[in-house]
Curated annotation (Swiss-Prot):
Pfam families in alphabetical order: Cpn60_TCP1
GO cellular component, one term: cytoplasm
GO molecular function: ATP binding; ATP hydrolysis activity; ATP-dependent protein folding chaperone; unfolded protein binding
Family that this chain belongs to: Belongs to the TCP-1 chaperonin family.
Protein name from the UniProt record: T-complex protein 1 subunit eta
Length: 353
């Protein structure tokens, strides 16, 4: 039921229709909701202007008239806007919840609007008021359970990545851990296709293999010496590294999604490293608590109460995947609306108010 999603999936050729798609996309990016409304409004304006075009009126005159109408409409909206800045925290929060409920009214989650509007407002309130960075709110979909089993994590959460043998021995909970973020592979690599090594005797081959092992062990030693308790990498962390870290009570995860990595980086203050040379405590991040928990049929890594930048993750539960995907789009719209209200500190009652 998301206007922007429907329009994006349509195979449109007509130039005027493409303009409507662009309008919906701009509305979705800037405001996050009202994509259907803006398309209906634009369509009606085009419909009304058709009569004047047929009468021979120049398009520039029509455009000028619409610009004047825009000024009057904006003036009217500003005059009728209600400020929420002068209200106390309780009243302001109630207003934000009502805004979230209005957004959810026309969506799939309308039946659960009281529950999810509270969740959305909590998520936006978690962010730092001066920034309200929407990228710091994540929504993770977990199939199974009831919709009302959804909950908010005050921090970053993402699904456990593929793990090699040895991860079972790794610790699953830390308080105030030091977090190392990498963009390097930590595994023994197979030879490239058509690679060729010419050796005179077996000792030469042994020295090549030993050198390769020494290289990866050197990388692992430097990471351990930095004092890191948690190691995350965008690239694979192999079974050798996994077991090496497990022996030293270090948690590791490879192939972490770029978006999740970015949120961990912003929240914990860690700096992504492309080499282990010069790896010091200064580039490590931290959070109040890290733990790996079971949610439904999946394992999730939770970074709670990150001090560097406040963040939040909504764990969205539900039966069918299609239902959860639609619910995610609905929540995104509600989050954008609440965020917009907090930034502008003004709201305008709708026609049904």
């Amino acid at each position: 039921n998301d206007g922007a999603t429907i329009l994006n999936l349509l195979d449109i050729v007509h130039p005027a229709a493409k303009t409507l798609v662009d309008i919906a996309k701009a509305q979705d990016d800037e405001v996050g909701d009202g994509t259907t409304s803006v398309c209906l409004l634009a369509g009606e304006l085009l419909k009304e202007s058709k009569y004047f075009i047929e009468e021979g009126m120049h398009p520039q005159i029509i455009t000028k008239g619409y610009k004047e109408a825009l000024k009057l409409a904006l003036q009217f909206l500003h005059e009728n806007a209600h400020s929420v800045a002068d209200k106390n925290e309780t009243e302001k929060r109630e207003m934000l919840i009502k805004c979230a409920q209005t957004s959810l009214n026309s969506k799939l989650l309308a039946h659960y609007k009281e529950f999810f509007s509270e969740l959305v407002v909590q998520a936006v309130e978690t962010l730092e008021t001066n920034l309200l960075d929407k990228d710091l709110i994540g929504i993770k979909m977990v199939t199974g359970g009831s919709v009302t089993d959804s909950f908010l994590v005050s921090g970053v959460a993402f699904k456990k990545t593929f793990s090699y043998a040895g991860f079972e021995q790794q610790p699953k909970k830390f308080n105030n851990p030091k977090i190392c973020l990498l963009n390097i592979e930590l595994e023994l690599k197979a030879e490239k296709e058509n690679a060729e090594i010419r050796i005179e005797n077996p000792d030469d081959y042994k020295s090549i293999v030993d050198a390769e092992w020494e290289l990866i062990y050197e990388k692992l030693r430097k990471i351990v010496e930095s004092g890191a308790n948690i190691v995350l990498s965008k690239l694979p962390i192999g079974d050798l590294a996994t077991q090496y870290f497990a022996d030293r009570n270090i948690f590791c995860a490879g192939r972490v999604d770029a978006e999740d990595m970015k949120r961990v980086q912003k929240s914990t203050g860690a700096i992504v490293q492309t080499t282990v040379n010069g790896l010091t405590e200064d580039v490590l991040g931290t959070c109040n608590q890290f733990e790996e928990v079971q949610i439904g049929a999946e394992r999730y890594n939770l970074f709670k109460d990150c001090p560097h930048s406040k963040s939040a993750t909504i764990i969205l539960r539900g039966g069918a995947e299609q239902f959860i995907a639609e619910a995610e789009r609905s929540l995104n719209d509600a989050i954008m609306i609440v965020r917009r209200c907090m930034k502008a500190n003004k709201i305008v009652p709708g026609g049904g108010a």
